[in-house]
């Protein structure tokens, strides 16, 4: 046999580290994120395909150890053995190793066996190092795991290969193991030995283990969070970059009369009402289930557990498509304090998450609590906007959005930390969730596409108060209404008034600086540009140089879409590789014709590119070929070999 070469993973949509994708295997295609029900090869009685399983996982070691199952698997194949015609992943016996301390098979033997029975995705025999062990023991076992992963490549023939990330609760070892595995020619990466963390609700440590691993894994390879089968965890895990989950929980919990839900777990004997609207919950009452024989009751509860689990996977995929995954995460994490603690821990990894966060999304940003202030969108905005504020700031309380349309033309009643006089002042609205909003940017995503409760919580007040104090270190005056709202007392009164009208040219220049970097505004928009407004909305729509279109201001997010003249100006005025995606010779003629750019043809790009950025498509000599919208971030563009990377808007340069 030869390696099945059509394996493919393609990213279809993104929200932070979360992504939906297509995983193509020899026995079919899987939509990710995906849940893999665990199938017991000898006693499976539950239908998993009906509720939604596109891929399953079974234990090759159990098959190997049972003479009857082994003979049937070798003669008929694992698909016929477990009666599932879709993709099958097999485990190598690592679970038994972690439970019993020893197993009766060597790594080469179990790798060959998985290949011989026709599994789609096999797994090397890693060492599942438990949480809390010494650094010395953990590194020794990581080295064994790495050696076995390398060895597995030699023995596998046709199947795809899992290489498991280990490292216990030592983030440095997780990163080390992941970085070494990333160098190997394997296809997927489980993140292992995390079940004890989940069982004991140690979600903060789980976040460290997962994100330390993901930080070093290639974006082109799906990541499998091993043993994560409870639906209350799916949203958080996907937001950390996990694509696959396996669930034995659906049947194990059913054995104990426990029903899964996204809010937690219900014991059947405590229920007065059934918890969801699946067929089991609508057809039976708790008392009716309690009156059944044990096997029938177990099967029905398992069916419910599968339905609620697959429903949550579908909801997570839709949330990624809509761009509101983090709102779902914040909702789910309020099901348990330890889960919320884990989510809060993610704020320690904002620089990692920011690399994968799209620049613009189709959904608004909702402030649902103080955790929202730790989201990457807020982190990114504050980092960028402070570069563009300049000096002499007038900080004002929020009004109805867009602020620039609802504020009075002139505002009086300001105070300051030091005596101030004269003008002009740059007007900055101070408001949740983004804190600092210059009027020139009040129609730009995500500042305009956000909402927060009118009654602030204490964390929100302190967040805004801290920003105001930081800005008062320079020349700043503060609206008395804002001082009152935030409980700030300032010694000096400013007796003048502040002009709030925003000049159109100032607006488009600042948007360009915010979007493309400092200096882009004057580069794109000289003093003689012509600005057109929409007849319907009155908002800026097009910016021209004579009759040549420089940019369109997109109505949905207030960001700039490059026209032909804008692309030429940005290309001439910036050095390679700024805002560029370079394609090879094979792709060049297609890009010139306006065809989309696929990841496998990209030879270089600007490391600062994020999904939904406007980009310049060039060849190896930096000749401008076309413009387009990035669908992937820079790291994904350079790593993936499948799928669209840039949706080309205009070619023919």
Swiss-Prot record:
It catalyses: guanosine(15) in tRNA + 7-cyano-7-deazaguanine = 7-cyano-7-carbaguanosine(15) in tRNA + guanine. PROSITE patterns: PUA (PS50890). One of its GO terms (molecular function) is pentosyltransferase activity. GO terms for biological process: tRNA wobble guanine modification. InterPro entries: ArchSynthase1/Queuine_TRR, PUA, PUA-like_sf, PUA_sf, TGT-like_sf, TGT_C2, TGT_C2_sf, TgtA. The active site is at 91 (nucleophile). Pathway: tRNA modification; archaeosine-tRNA biosynthesis. It comes from the Archaea. Zn(2+) binds at residues 276, 278, 281. Binds 1 zinc ion per subunit. Substrate binds at residues 126, 193. Exchanges the guanine residue with 7-cyano-7-deazaguanine (preQ0) at position 15 in the dihydrouridine loop (D-loop) of archaeal tRNAs. This is tRNA-guanine(15) transglycosylase. It comes from Methanothermobacter thermautotrophicus (strain ATCC 29096 / DSM 1053 / JCM 10044 / NBRC 100330 / Delta H). The gene is tgtA.
């Amino acid at each position: 046999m030869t390696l099945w070469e059509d394996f493919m993973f393609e990213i279809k949509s993104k929200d932070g580290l979360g992504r939906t994708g297509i995983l193509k295997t020899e026995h079919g295609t899987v939509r990710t994120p995906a849940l893999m029900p665990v199938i017991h090869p000898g006693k499976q009685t539950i239908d998993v395909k009906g509720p939604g399983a596109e891929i399953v996982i079974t234990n090759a070691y159990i098959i190997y150890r049972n003479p009857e199952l082994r003979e049937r698997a070798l003669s008929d194949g694992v698909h016929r053995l477990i009666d599932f015609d879709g993709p099958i992943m097999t485990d190598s016996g690592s679970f038994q190793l972690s439970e019993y301390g020893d197993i009766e098979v060597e790594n080469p033997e179990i790798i060959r066996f998985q290949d011989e029975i026709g599994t789609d995705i096999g797994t090397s025999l890693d060492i599942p190092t438990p949480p809390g062990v010494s650094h010395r023991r953990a590194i020794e076992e990581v080295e064994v795991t790495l050696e076995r992963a390398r060895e597995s490549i030699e023995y596998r023939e046709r199947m795809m290969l899992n290489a498991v990330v280990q490292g216990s609760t030592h983030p440095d070892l997780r990163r080390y193991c992941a970085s070494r595995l990333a160098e190997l020619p394997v296809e997927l990466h489980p993140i292992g030995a995390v079940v004890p963390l989940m069982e004991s609700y140690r979600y903060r440590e789980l976040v460290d283990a997962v994100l330390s691993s993901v930080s070093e894994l290639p974006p082109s390879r799906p990541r499998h969070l091993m043993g994560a089968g409870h639906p209350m965890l799916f949203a958080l895990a996907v937001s950390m970059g996990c694509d696959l989950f396996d669930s034995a929980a659906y049947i194990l919990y059913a054995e104990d009369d426990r029903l899964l839900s996204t809010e937690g777990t219900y014991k059947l004997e405590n229920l007065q009402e059934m918890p969801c609207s699946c067929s089991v919950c609508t057809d039976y009452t708790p008392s009716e289930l309690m009156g059944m024989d044990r096997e029938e009751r177990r099967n029905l509860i398992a069916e419910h557990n599968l339905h609620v689990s697959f429903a949550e996977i579908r909801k997570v995929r839709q949330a990624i498509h809509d761009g509101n995954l983090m709102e779902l995460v914040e909702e789910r994490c309020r099901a348990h304090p330890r889960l919320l603690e884990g989510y809060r821990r993610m704020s320690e990894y904002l620089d990692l998450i920011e690399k994968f966060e799209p620049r613009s999304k189709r959904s608004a940003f909702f402030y649902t609590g103080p955790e929202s202030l730790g989201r990457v969108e807020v982190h990114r905005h504050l980092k960028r906007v402070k570069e563009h504020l300049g000096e002499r700031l007038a900080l004002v309380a929020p009004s109805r959005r867009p602020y620039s349309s609802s504020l009075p033309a002139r505002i009086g009643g300001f105070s300051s930390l030091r005596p101030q006089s004269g003008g002009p002042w740059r007007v900055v609205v101070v408001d949740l969730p983004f804190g600092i909003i210059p009027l020139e940017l009040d129609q730009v995503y995500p500042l305009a596409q956000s909402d927060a409760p009118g009654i602030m919580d204490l964390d929100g007040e302190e967040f805004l108060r801290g920003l105001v104090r930081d800005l008062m270190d320079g020349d700043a005056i503060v609206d008395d209404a804002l001082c009152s709202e935030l409980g700030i007392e300032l010694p000096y009164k400013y007796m003048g008034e502040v002009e709030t009208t925003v000049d159109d040219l100032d607006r488009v220049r600042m948007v360009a600086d915010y979007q493309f970097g400092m200096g882009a505004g004057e580069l794109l928009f000289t003093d003689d540009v012509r600005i057109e407004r929409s007849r319907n909305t009155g908002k800026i729509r097009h910016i021209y140089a004579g009759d040549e279109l420089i940019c369109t201001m997109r109505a949905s997010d207030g960001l700039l879409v490059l026209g032909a003249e804008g692309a030429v100006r940005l290309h001439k005025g910036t050095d390679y590789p700024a805002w560029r995606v370079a394609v090879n010779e094979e792709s060049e003629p297609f890009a010139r014709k306006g065809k989309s750019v696929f990841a496998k043809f990209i030879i270089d790009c600007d490391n600062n590119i994020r999904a939904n950025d406007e980009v310049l498509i060039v060849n190896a000599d930096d000749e401008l070929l076309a413009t387009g919208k990035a669908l992937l971030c820079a790291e994904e563009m350079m790593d993936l070999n499948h799928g669209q990377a840039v949706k080309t808007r205009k070619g023919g340069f």
